[in-house]
Amino acid sequence: MDFFESLSKAMGLKPEQKQEPQFSGDGEDTLEKSERAQEAKSIIEDPLALNQSEGYKEKPQSLSFDTLRKMSVRNTVVGAIIQTRVNQISTFSQPARYTKDGIGFEIKLRDPKATPTQEQRDRALALESFIENCGYDYNPGRDNFDTLIRKIVRDTLTFDQLSFEIVEDRLGRPAELHAVDAATVRAAEVEVNNGEDYVHPTDIEDEDRIKWVQVVNGQIVAEFTGSQLAFGVRNPRTDLSIQPYGLSELEILVKQVTSHLWAEDYNSRYFSQGGTTKGILNMKGQNVSRTQLDAFRRQWTAQLAGTTGSWKTPVVSVEGLEYINVSQSNREMEYEMWMNYLINICCAVYQIDPSEVNFPNRGGAGGTSGGGLGDGGIEDRLKNSRDKGLRPLLRFIESVINRYVIRRFSDEFTFNFVGLDGETERERLEISNKQVRAFKTINEVRKENDLPPIPDGNIVLDPTYTNYIMQKMQLEQAREMEEQEEESSDSGIEVVPDGLDDRYNQR
């Protein structure tokens, strides 16, 4: 049983469904794309939920898109995290060949071992220009890649949903890219045969199906096929009721964000209500009229309310007035530790180190030193933060652009962000210095830096290797001297050391 028979048996194909393998005639046996033998059986979306809607599927969630947007703006910790990630991603929004540190994006061949031809280089530069301008030509009225990427990164960190429209040319290729408010994009209503049979989404061709709609004020204002709108989520799930939407970090942090707002409000009330209001005023043994009580309340508020009244001592002329303090400790809620805990939880969910948003982590939620990933210092913590949070976000954006844009032009090329692991000039010099003393020659290092070779530069500056070469040269010189002495003794000619011939002639 050969490989293809085993593959057919594993796939459960009937004998009449088996096909002979087809190969290309390029000299290498390359298996061509095969057609599926049966339709998908699984259901990935709830058909009833889609058809009971107003032509689109609403995301079932406790928080609306508008609430998620307000949370990302009004909570300072979440806002700082999102803004930090947006700024970090924006540093990769220009071609890497334009920057000195090599940070940016590049278009290269998908096969890393292939050497590009001149035609492929020209096509890569054309694709690079298209991505940079978000279109074939420069248009100041259209978003460039920096603006586009800032918009979609903010959307994906807020809603776990990004989208941009792909305006096609006459050949069906991308001509322009326009960012779309992700909060207005919904999945279109699924098609059902005869009102009974469920149709798997993969069984419907994208060019024939309206896959996405834009909803504004509850009304559908635009419709898009799968090739006209890019849609991506970072946290996909198999839940039938959720498909095809993702899971936003803010949905996970509802309780923590609310607690943080309450804690800030609790502390800010000190300035709005004064510092001596956490107690009870008791007028003992007096029948105070409503008018007198209101007058006393106005006097008390005038003296203590606002930032100017904080921690002031009230002076009143009321007999039998007693103040009962109900705040026995200024650490009754462990305010600082509680705030530190909430900030750390928010940063953990967003996969970012608190120090990146200017909140130093003192080792844990309690603010005491302790073991953890940050023991190696700030550089180790930042590197760990980049590996956990920034790198996956960059890879996600790469996959979206490759899927919806680059692959529409050619399968030969791929879009990549580069420079995340780039070193500084000092680090590069230190690395080159170590390499030239271990396994690289001087001329090899000079070639990497676009410098011409130097005479006698094909040597590794390792002391052991250098001593070995020197000893070898000395042995060869000594052997040559012995051979010359033997030849001169046989011929009777006196061997004169180099440099002494002129002195003998002068005499």
From Swiss-Prot:
Swiss-Prot/TrEMBL GO biological process terms: symbiont genome ejection through host cell envelope, contractile tail mechanism
Pfam families: Phage_portal
Domain of life assignment: Viruses
GO molecular-function term, one example from the UniProt record: DNA binding
GO CC terms, sorted: viral capsid
Record's subcellular location: Virion
NADP found in the keyword field: no
Compositional bias segments (type: Basic and acidic residues): 30-44
Chain spans, region Disordered: 1-44, 476-507
InterPro entries per UniProt: Phage/GTA_portal
Keyword match Transmembrane: no
Keywords: Capsid protein, DNA-binding, Viral capsid assembly, Viral contractile tail ejection system, Viral genome ejection through host cell envelope, Viral genome packaging, Viral penetration into host cytoplasm, Viral release from host cell, Virion, Virus entry into host cell
Chief place of localization: virion
Family statement: Belongs to the phage portal family.
Complex and partners: Homododecamer.
Function, in words: Forms the portal vertex of the capsid. This portal plays critical roles in head assembly, genome packaging, neck/tail attachment, and genome ejection. The portal protein multimerizes as a single ring-shaped homododecamer arranged around a central channel. Binds to the terminase subunits to form the packaging machine.
This protein's name: Probable portal protein
Organism: Bacillus phage SP01
